[in-house]
């Protein structure tokens, strides 16, 4: 929506200084009491709270939400052959019980070894065999023994929520790192823009004629990976599994036909919808998406965005810059820092809506 300049393609142009105390270590309670920086077109930022959202949207708008659910992906076990402690992060399932994982210590877990999980290594609750190394990630392919139902049951008992590396507290309430509308297990990180919604807020929006429609994009570990090429156009985006239901496509088409706005809740919802429309036509179905959105991108569907404040030099900052312009985004971030906003996964939010009107 904004024409790029050559400077928009330099990685250093997406850097900014964030005081460490602005990194939120826990979520605001209640969920919708997070602050909301409203970014209209060609006006100053408005400072609101997330519970003000109904006054900032209008009947006929459609919110696209990502209904992925975070799995308790971090496991601690022992190498059966030696008793060496092992930490496993489940990354993505490729068939029942067969997982790409990141492991510590990786060098000691060669194909053919096995890992026991549970308080008693002599009688483990889960056992996984190391089948192969993965050169692309440095991880390991593990096959868990037993039935899928038993695996998921034990994972719920043994697994821990994989909080982002910049959060140094533990999840006292794992549900606080899930959206209230999460349904489909498979993510290793939450679609954090959605953490601000409450059931009551969603009901209020629905009563006003502001609908929601789900997509599923299972957020992977690549979401935390920084861009490491100086010319961002050379960046290779990680891929993630996504599904866009036919009913969501129908709602989007009806919204557009009626003159409504399609507003993505989070960058993952953006990538799912824009990825499904990459051919020029929005199509339902399941696929993998590795769409990298940066200044110069030609938007297909999305009119607005609800998102948190992102890490410097991240692909997420580049996506938001494609919507409102890099200079304006950095200016908004500077204002947010000065106004003591909270940043990153448990932080505050932005509503980017070019034709927003102050109520």
Curated annotation (Swiss-Prot):
Localization per Swiss-Prot or TrEMBL: Cytoplasm
Family matches, as Gene3D superfamilies: QueA-like
Chief localization: cytoplasm
GO cellular component: cytoplasm
Database matches in InterPro entries: QueA, QueA_dom1, QueA_dom2, QueA_sf
Keyword Cytoplasm belongs to the record: yes
Keywords of this entry: Cytoplasm, Queuosine biosynthesis, S-adenosyl-L-methionine, Transferase
EC number(s) on file: 2.4.99.17
Any one biological process term the GO annotation gives: tRNA wobble guanine modification
GO molecular function per UniProt: S-adenosylmethionine:tRNA ribosyltransferase-isomerase activity
Domain of life of the organism encoding this protein: Bacteria
Pathway: tRNA modification; tRNA-queuosine biosynthesis
Reaction catalyzed: 7-aminomethyl-7-carbaguanosine(34) in tRNA + S-adenosyl-L-methionine = epoxyqueuosine(34) in tRNA + adenine + L-methionine + 2 H(+)
Oligomer and partners: Monomer.
Family, per entry: Belongs to the QueA family.
Function: Transfers and isomerizes the ribose moiety from AdoMet to the 7-aminomethyl group of 7-deazaguanine (preQ1-tRNA) to give epoxyqueuosine (oQ-tRNA).
NCBIfam families: PRK00147.1 (NF001140), queA (TIGR00113)
Protein name in UniProt: S-adenosylmethionine:tRNA ribosyltransferase-isomerase
Name of the gene encoding the protein in the UniProt record: queA
């Amino acid at each position: 929506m904004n024409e790029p300049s050559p400077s928009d393609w330099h990685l250093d142009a997406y850097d900014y200084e964030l005081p460490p105390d602005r990194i939120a270590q826990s979520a605001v309670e209640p969920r919708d009491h997070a602050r909301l920086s409203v970014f209209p077109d060609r006006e100053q930022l408005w400072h609101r709270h997330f519970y003000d959202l109904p006054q900032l949207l209008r009947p006929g708008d459609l919110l696209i939400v990502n209904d992925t659910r975070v799995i308790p992906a971090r496991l601690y076990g022992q190498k059966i052959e030696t008793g060496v402690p092992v930490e496993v992060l489940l990354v993505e399932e490729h068939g029942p019980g067969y997982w790409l994982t990141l492991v510590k210590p990786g060098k000691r877990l060669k194909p053919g070894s096995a890992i026991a999980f549970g308080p008693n290594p002599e009688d483990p609750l889960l056992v996984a065999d190391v089948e192969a190394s993965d050169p692309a990630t440095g991880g390991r392919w593990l096959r868990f023994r037993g039935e899928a139902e038993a695996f998921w049951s034990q994972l719920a008992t043994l697994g821990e929520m994989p909080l982002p590396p910049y959060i140094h507290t533990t999840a006292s309430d794992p549900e606080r790192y899930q959206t209230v509308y999460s349904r489909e297990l498979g993510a290793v990180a939450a679609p954090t823009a959605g953490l601000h919604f409450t059931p009551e807020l969603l009901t209020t929006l629905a009563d006003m004629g502001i609908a929601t429609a789900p997509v599923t994009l299972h957020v992977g570990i690549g979401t935390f990976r920084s861009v490491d090429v100086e010319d961002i156009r050379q960046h290779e985006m990680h891929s993630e599994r996504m599904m866009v239901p036919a009913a969501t496509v129908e709602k989007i088409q009806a919204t557009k036909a009626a003159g409504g706005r399609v507003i993505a809740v989070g960058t993952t919802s953006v990538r799912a919808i824009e990825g499904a429309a990459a051919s020029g036509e929005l199509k339902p179905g399941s696929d993998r998406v590795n769409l990298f959105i940066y200044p110069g991108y030609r938007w297909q569907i999305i009119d607005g965005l609800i998102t948190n404040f992102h890490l410097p030099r991240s692909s997420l900052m580049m996506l938001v810059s494609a919507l409102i312009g890099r200079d304006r985004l950095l200016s908004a971030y500077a204002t947010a820092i000065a106004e003591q906003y909270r940043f990153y996964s448990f932080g505050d939010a932005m509503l980017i809506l070019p034709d927003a009107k102050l109520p």
